Swiss-Prot record:
Family: Belongs to the NAD-dependent glycerol-3-phosphate dehydrogenase family.
Annotated metabolic or biological route of this protein: Membrane lipid metabolism; glycerophospholipid metabolism
Cellular component, GO, one term: cytosol
Protein name from the UniProt record: Glycerol-3-phosphate dehydrogenase [NAD(P)+]
Record: residues binding sn-glycerol 3-phosphate: 105, 135, 137, 190, 243, 253-255
Protein species of origin: Maridesulfovibrio salexigens (strain ATCC 14822 / DSM 2638 / NCIMB 8403 / VKM B-1763) (Desulfovibrio salexigens)
């Protein structure tokens, strides 16, 4: 059995390494040849996962054909805004009915498409079998083999059971959920809430504020999710509540760090000069316009959007949230 992992960021490298350590024939596609050579020659990904030596059994290449040819499973771990273009470039290397597991978190800008829609549209004619992997995970902690649980959203029971077995280890527990739409949306929207929580912490607003943002964040997830066909109950699970709590409270969260710096007075363009992929920045824009299109009220998302893209003062945004019309929970 061969597994092709597309994307060698921190999360892609961690998942590929986890699979290789378990004994699976795992091939990692690395976009930059220089980084690919480093991984091959030293066993380290110094750019995205510098603290961990990778399994000597992990194979990597910058040639997508070499990585994908003959693969039984395809794990997609590229930034959400680049998934469509990556699949367009690589479509020729997918077989018919490929087993595709997506671990990218986000909503596509301009189209408002979740990752499942991007995959189905990009691989039209190939009839992919689709699953989405999400949940409360920091790459660093999984690489350190700290106990971790995530969820696989998949409507195909056979594929769900296969992937669950492939990924499960003594330190990584995989649950399944047929609601892949809810699983993927939870993993995307929580990044917006993490930015909001980071800003609140940067403003020294305290634990009460953070708890309110997390709780009302779940409400926003559920409202948008139901409007897009997801089950509200999914957002109380690992990809919703679990991931939301982790990214709103954990210092390893890149989205929370962006919010923290904004709350401390830094400007977004300064923050983005750092080499960190904070999916929530683009996802905020995508979800803001998607919610307008669907007529779904997302007050936290709206204020985060105004801070990021209209230079609104974070403290003023929080005050505006608190002074909205009073209503039932």
């Amino acid at each position: 059995m061969k597994i092709a992992v597309i994307g060698a960021g921190a999360w892609g490298t961690t998942l590929a390494n986890t699979l290789a350590k378990k004994g699976h024939n795992t091939h990692l596609w690395v976009r930059e040849q220089e980084l690919c050579d480093e991984i091959t020659n030293t066993g380290y990904n110094s750019v995205f996962l510098p603290d961990f030596k990778l399994s000597p059994d992990l194979k990597c290449s910058s040639n997508p054909q070499q990585v994908m040819e003959g693969a039984d499973y395809f794990l997609l771990v590229v930034p959400s805004q680049f998934l469509r273009s990556a699949l367009a470039d690589m479509k020729q290397y997918f077989p018919q009915n490929p087993a595709v597991v997506c671990a990218s978190k986000g909503i596509e800008l301009n189209t408002g498409a979740p990752m499942s829609q991007v995959v189905f549209e990009s691989l039209e004619g190939l009839n992919p079998r689709f699953a989405h992997l999400s949940g409360p995970t920091f790459a660093y902690e999984l690489s350190a083999e700290l106990p971790t649980s995530i969820v696989l959203g998949c409507g195909d029971e056979k594929l769900a059971a296969e992937v669950q077995d492939i990924f499960s280890t003594p330190y990584l527990r995989i649950y399944t959920n047929p609601d892949y739409r809810g699983v993927e949306l939870g993993g995307a929207i929580k990044n917006i809430m993490a930015i909001a929580a980071g800003m609140a912490d940067g403003l020294k607003f305290g634990h009460n504020t953070r708890a309110a943002l997390i709780t009302r964040g779940i409400a926003e997830m559920s409202r948008l999710g139901e409007a897009m066909g997801a089950q509200a109950s999914t957002f109380m699970g690992l990809s919703g509540m679990g991931d939301l709590v982790l990214t709103c409270t954990g210092d390893l969260s890149r989205n929370r760090q962006v919010g923290l710096k904004l709350g401390q007075g830094m400007k977004l363009n300064e923050i983005l000069k750092m080499r960190m992929v904070a999916e929530g920045v683009k996802t905020t824009e995508s979800v803001y316009f998607l919610a307008k299109k669907l007529g779904v009220e997302l007050p936290i998302t709206e204020q985060v959007y105004k801070i990021l893209y209209e230079d609104k003062d974070p403290a003023t945004a929080v005050c505006d949230l608190m002074n909205r019309d009073l209503k039932a929970e």
